[in-house]
Amino acid sequence: AGVMAQHLQTMRNKHAITLEHLRFGALKGLILDADGSVIYNLFTEFGITPKSFQWDIATHNSGFNVGQACRELLRYIEENLQGERMSGVHVFVGKDFFEALVKHDDVVEAYKRYQDGLVLRSDMRSGFTFCGITFEEHRGKATAPGGGVRRFVEDDEGHAFPLGTMDTFATYYAPADFNETANTVALPLYAKQEPRKFDRGTDLHTQANPLPLCHRPQLLVKLEIA
């Protein structure tokens, strides 16, 4: 029983990574296949021009105003909410973007006197807030069926999206392809076992059929280092 449970947990973990990969596709306005290929680009399907901002944060003394750029990002998302409310904006960023941001003079100066600069001496990668926007470094990655490794967020970019909206994102599930699951409400994960001939072992099968989707891709914004 213990060995069986370990195998099931390993299979569950693989499904969780796949779901994370698909959800990051939704954050980019894409419906992805398991191998990372694009099935549908929602910007193309709905005739929406993707929005991106160039942040010149890697060049020292560039004069780039991070606070002004944050307010510009907030105003763009607020405008495209079209009357809906949000509780905040979150940005998943890659390591190069994060390093450039936390080393920028505007950010350093803002946190220098807060708790005697404790934040600057701490590991901020799990998230810090600047001008009403929370920035979090994301290091997640997945292995494709062919063996290649894909990062969910590229090192020099970020992906911004609103929090607390009613219907921006959803994850739909389809039932497993078993006789007993036809015309039933889908579950997030299915697991079955079947004994081998002459009781010489047990075969395990797990299945998940998720479809993470962004209903309003115009609220998704890409940030890039200029």
Give each language-model segment a name.
Residues 108-226:
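Sequence/fold signature of self-assembling virion shell proteins
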Residues 39-115:
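Extended, solvent-exposed, turn-rich assembly/linker loops in the middle of proteins
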Residues 11, 37-41, 65, 137, ...:
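Secondary-structure junction/capping motif
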